[in-house]
Regions:
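Bacterial Sec-dependent N-terminal signal peptides
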Residues: 1-23
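Structural recognition of the beta-strand scaffold that forms the well-ordered cores
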Residues: 43-52, 59, 92-95, 115-119, ...
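Metal-dependent peptidase/peptidase-like ectodomains
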Residues: 185-298
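A non-catalytic alpha/beta surface segment that caps or lines the substrate-entry region
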Residues: 42-121
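Alpha-helical metal-binding/catalytic segments enriched in His/Glu/Asp
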Residues: 118, 133-192, 354
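N-terminal capping segment at the start of a domain
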Residues: 21-68, 280, 322, 330-337
């Protein structure tokens, strides 16, 4: 293997010496134009508005017009509806609701679960594929049951929600053969219940979901323990062996054949890396071969559990001083998921990466 590697290097040097043409990176001009329209100022405006609602805890008020999850979801719906009016009938938006009873865990009152969904209908009647981009609009303080205290949630997951809104803003002006769904889900912090509701409905209706891009915590460039500051890398988490309809015999055969890395989720992650790095400059997409961070979860999981192909997209360096923290200053350290800790150029790149992948997938 080492000799082969040396031969490849030598051949590369040889051919470049004799004037071989450089590799040309192919881009779809229409998609490249959409990528260029992703705006850090627009993303900042989306997140500023989301933060202004004080808290977006799933258990918070739905009747107050200026505070709580109800006000936030109504604003997101208003954005989707505004884009729908300019789409020539291609985009439609709605509140997707379901009743949820107290579960003795993270829900202590009856809820009307409400996801905000915008659908860009595919132009090809024979193409039934559906691609989903998701972020969760809800957030939490240190106590997940605290529904009244301030919880800015700028990054977790204002960043993912803003990316969804921005992609809808730009992509709704175009048409694609396949259908794209933009969704801001609720109930993530309460146990992935909003995405669970959507995934279960998709399974029951036999929706042909080809891929789910779940964006969660993707807008900050620094970590609190290593002090790394880097806005050039983003992680994509993908599962190997799926728990969906996986029996022991199939698992053993997969292991015997060495096919753990051939799962649809891992193939999607590879596609995301190749496409995203082709369209977005100065961004390295790091594939992480595990479903999620250690002992963590996200809204891609309910889809995976029902047999759909899904991945999680997350910033490279997380800062736990700015996740699920009550806003405060302690021992000179500023805690809280505040907008001041966001890097909007980094979020622009990560949003553009999502858009480039959605557009290429829906046109393929």
């Amino acid at each position: 293997m080492r000799k082969l590697f040396c031969v490849i290097l030598a051949l590369g040097a040889y051919t470049s010496t004799f004037g071989q043409s450089p590799v040309v990176i192919q881009k779809d001009p229409q998609i490249a134009k959409m990528v260029s329209e992703v705006s850090p100022d627009s993303l900042r405006a989306h997140i500023t508005k989301l933060v202004s609602y004080g808290t977006r805890n799933t258990l918070s008020t739905v009747s107050d017009k200026k505070r709580g999850i109800g006000a936030a979801r109504n604003w997101i719906l208003s954005r989707f509806n505004a884009y729908a009016k300019e789409s020539g009938g291609r985009l439609t938006a709605k509140l997707d609701t379901s009743s949820y009873k107290p579960d003795g865990k993270r829900v202590d009152v009856p809820l009307v679960l409400t996801n905000v969904v915008a659908t860009l209908k595919g132009s090809d009647p024979n193409d039934h594929r559906v691609f989903i981009i998701s972020g969760h609009m809800d957030n939490m303080r240190t106590d997940v049951m605290d529904r009244t205290g301030d919880a800015p949630g700028a990054n977790d997951d204002g960043s993912g929600t803003a990316a969804v809104i921005e992609c809808a803003r730009i992509m709704s002006k175009q048409s694609f053969p396949a259908t794209i769904i933009f969704v801001a889900v609720c109930g993530e912090e309460q146990g992935l219940i909003g995405s669970g509701f959507m995934a279960e409905n998709a399974k029951k209706s036999k929706m042909e979901i080809a891929a789910v891009l779940n964006n969660d915590i993707m807008g900050s460039n620094n970590s609190n323990e290593t002090n790394i500051i880097d806005n050039t890398k983003v992680r994509v988490f993908s599962e190997g062996l799926s728990s969906y309809e996986l029996d022991v015999k199939k698992a053993l055969n997969t292991r015997f054949m060495g096919q753990e890395n051939d799962s649809p989720s891992r193939q999607l992650a590879r596609y995301i890396k190749e496409t995203g790095e082709r369209y977005v400059d100065n961004l390295q997409i790091v594939m992480v071969y595990r479903p999620d961070r250690f002992l963590r979860g996200g809204d891609h999981a309910p889809y995976q559990e029902r047999g759909f192909t899904a991945v999680r997209i997350t910033e490279m360096n997380e800062n736990y001083n700015h996740q699920h923290q009550n806003v405060r200053t302690e021992n000179g350290i500023r805690y809280g998921d505040l907008i001041e800790f966001m890097d909007f150029e980094y979020l622009r790149k990560n949003t553009a990466m999502n858009l480039s992948n959605l557009a290429n997938l829906a046109k393929s």
